[in-house]
A protein has these predicted regions:
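Conserved phosphate- and dinucleotide-binding cores of soluble alpha/beta proteins
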Residues: 1-219
């Protein structure tokens, strides 16, 4: 499953050497076309609806709509089915990749707003994070750039800013990925979470994040 945004879309470009991938996602976009044509996406090893690309809707170009039109490999289902965490979990080795606007030092994820300004809905992020966590061999992943606005703002933040909401709670978050590394927060203490997240923040912001963490007794 890939959520909406530049990061999930970019992941598709690096899957060209994989084999026997399957798709169960609320949404699919243009990236699947090339992967199907290369034989990367076959869905043959899926444990739920093998041979089918399962989704609720598509978002992309005319080429994508031509691809799905009368395509027997496409299985469109309502979100009550695709996004049900227990349904998601029936897919063995389910990997859910979703993005975020910011992640605080305790592991809380905000994906829809910056302060009081809303940029989008949060879609099926929580559903797929929980479903992948329940899946045998599954991996729930939050992926984001470490900075925004040309490197002037850290996306690993001391705390979710005022007015913003928590999309995925610290209790649900497992893997967090930036260009500086990968950490697994599941089952970690607040001290461990703060240390791990500071390590994948942009180096320019690590010192101030550490100062905050010490002042607020995270470290």
């Amino acid at each position: 499953q890939l959520g909406i945004g530049r990061i999930p879309d970019s992941v598709v470009k690096f899957l060209g050497d994989r084999k026997h991938l399957g798709v169960h996602s609320e949404m699919v976009s243009d990236g699947i076309i090339e992967l199907v044509e290369k034989g990367v996406i076959t869905c043959q090893q899926k444990t739920l609806l093998p041979g089918k690309i399962v989704t609720s809707f598509v978002l992309g170009s005319h080429a994508l709509f031509d691809f799905v039109d009368n395509n027997p490999a496409m299985e469109f289902r309502p979100t009550q089915f695709t996004n049900d965490p227990f349904t998601v979990a029936r897919n063995r080795k389910m990997v859910a990749i979703n993005s975020a606007l910011e992640v605080d030092l305790t592991g809380q994820v905000c994906a829809d707003s910056m302060g009081y300004n809303f940029f989008s809905g949060f879609g099926g992020q929580v559903d797929f994070i929980r479903g992948a966590a329940k899946s045998e061999g599954g991996k729930p992943i939050i992926a984001l750039p470490s900075t925004a606005k040309n490197g002037t703002i850290s996306r690993i933040v001391p705390r979710i800013r005022e007015g913003a909401g928590v999309t995925t709670s610290r209790g649900d978050v497992h893997y967090v990925v930036t260009e500086h590394g990968v950490v697994n927060l599941h089952g970690r203490t607040i001290k461990q979470r703060a240390e791990l997240l500071i390590n994948i923040a942009h180096p320019h912001f690590r010192e101030e994040l550490e100062v905050f963490a010490k002042e607020h007794h995270y470290l």
